[in-house]
Amino acid sequence: AKGTIKDTLLARQLIVLFNQFARNQIDTSLMRQMVEKQAEIANKFNNFRGKINGKEVSDNEISEVLKNEQNPKKRQEAWEASKQVGQAVAPFVVELVKLRNQAAKQLGYENYYVMALATDEQDINEVVRIFDNLKQLTDEPFKHIKQELDASIAKRFGIKPQDIQPWHYANPFFQEVSEYGEIDLDKYFKGKNIEEISRTFYNGINLPVDDILKNSDLYPRKGKYQHAFCNDIDRLGDVRIMCNLSDNLYWTNTMLHEIGHATYSKNIQRDLPFLLRTEAHTFLTEATAILMGRQANNVDWLQAMVGINKKEKQSLGKALFDNLRLSELAFSRWRHIPLQTAYA
């Protein structure tokens, strides 16, 4: 019974074990279907490359077009290329959703989303309340700053704000913003070695990362997974990251973010039991990673790490803050979508 075990380490291990096993107590045939479907989707998604006029292009190449290209037709082609992967995996994702919901209902949950939160020790009603409140608090600020962004984009392309199309934005999903204001933030990273900047920064705050970087996969190549993640290999300090580095703000932020995850995992107490030798909770490692990634938007960090001068520092302060503010407001809309979907 709950509360009968007084050894806190043992009690916590039992809770962790229960939550890890709980979602898998389903029919083995259904489990096999889910695993096979997940693998099929991952294979299709990871190997997919969108095409522009029949030529395969990487996500980084699409991003460059959406950041720099003035020709609306070329921008539209790049934006549409970024969406082609959806057509390739959508039917399989729908099948997986149905399988997962079937599994969750076998275990007495409303759907897979609710089950995933419950076994991650989060209450769906509390999470929904938090995000509904967040949306209410940010609706007006988002609306105001989005109007400013649209006015800036309309001016750049010589169109009216109401004529703006999705491909006029730099991010194909409008999950973040890099084009807000008159200052080109990417130019401060152009030609810089993002790997070495990251190494210098982390070593400088007494979180050495040479071992992490040595074993990591950091640069783009044909057929490689195009995004980024961190993986704790053995819970004994062998932590690795995957990136597709390019010399811009986005990949500097991402690199710092992933190493944030990695240094968290690397420095967990080694004398803890194996089951507890991982992040205390997902949101803690994520908070650490966000904190570290955000340094790329910090003028003091930029002055120290990429060498901006005092005059640039003064002009950049507001631009970086506004850029970060709008990016967070934009992404907050994405954070709210899964909750609406789960309760639709």
Q: Predicted segments — roles?
A:
Residues 246-269, 286-290:
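Active-site recognition of the HExxH zinc-binding catalytic motif
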Residues 131-141, 279-315:
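Post-HExxH zinc-binding segment in Zn-dependent metallohydrolases
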Residues 78-85, 117, 124-128, 176-187, ...:
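Glycine- and acidic
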Residues 1-87, 91:
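N-terminal helix-rich structural modules
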Residues 55-60, 94-242, 312-314, 319-320:
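Active-site-proximal, well-structured secondary-structure segments within enzyme catalytic domains
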Residues 298-344:
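Long, amphipathic alpha-helical stalk/connector segments used for oligomerization, subunit docking
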Residues 203-212, 234-236, 248, 262-274, ...:
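Secondary-structure transition/capping motifs at alpha-helix termini
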Residues 217-226, 276-286:
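Beta-rich nucleic-acid/ligand-interaction surfaces
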